A protein has these predicted regions:
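Extreme N-terminal starter segment of soluble prokaryotic enzymes
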Residues: 1-5
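Histidine-rich, glycine-flanked metal-binding segment
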Residues: 9-53
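Short beta-strand scaffold segments in enzyme catalytic cores
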Residues: 21-23, 109, 122-124
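Metal-associated gating/positioning segment near the N- to mid-region
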Residues: 50-112
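Positions that flank functional sites
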Residues: 115-116
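Metal-coordinating catalytic core of metallo-dependent amide/deamination hydrolases
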Residues: 123-154
């Protein structure tokens, strides 16, 4: 178990708790208390003077699809491509996954760009994981559609 001690906690409801401890087990918050006594096998992080929050969720991004090394966000062979899947285009070795995780983003919805009226499906992923299977939460989660300026100019 991971025990984060003495942090200033901020809940998603905006509640602040100073000098609180958080226990994390199997990647999930197990308990939040004023004092958690770690066991001999536990990993302890002293978060004194630091903020501790739940992992952030990015509900719409192009991580691993559109980055400095490539542009796989839009399929420009036609305006309607519901059959395309973001999961098939994502570069899971993209360094931006690590940067997102370092910033506290633990979950992302990765999808195509707005160059098509119908551009394909999003995938829900974790930003951490040693293998692809550890990262994938849902391969097809939402269908990207765009109206207005973006598909008009593409």
């Amino acid at each position: 178990m991971l025990v984060i001690k003495n942090g200033t906690l901020i809940s998603m409801a905006g509640i602040y708790k100073e000098k609180y401890d958080v226990a994390v087990e199997n990647g999930k918050i197990a308990k939040v208390e004023k004092e958690i006594v770690p066991g001999p096998e536990d990993t302890v992080i002293d978060a004194a003077g630091n903020l501790v929050t739940p992992g952030f969720i990015e509900p719409h991004c192009h991580l691993g699809i559109i980055d400095a090394d490539g542009q796989d966000g839009n399929e420009m062979t036609g305006p309607i491509h519901p059959e395309l899947r973001a999961i098939d285009a994502i570069d899971f070795h993209c360094s931006l996954f690590d940067r997102a995780l370092e910033a506290g983003v633990t979950t992302v919805a990765v999808g195509p760009g707005s160059g098509n009226i119908m551009g394909g499906t999003f995938a829900y992923l974790k930003t951490a994981g040693a293998t692809l299977n550890e990262r994938i939460m849902k391969e097809e989660a939402a269908l990207k559609m765009a109206l207005g300026e973006n598909p008009k100019v593409s």
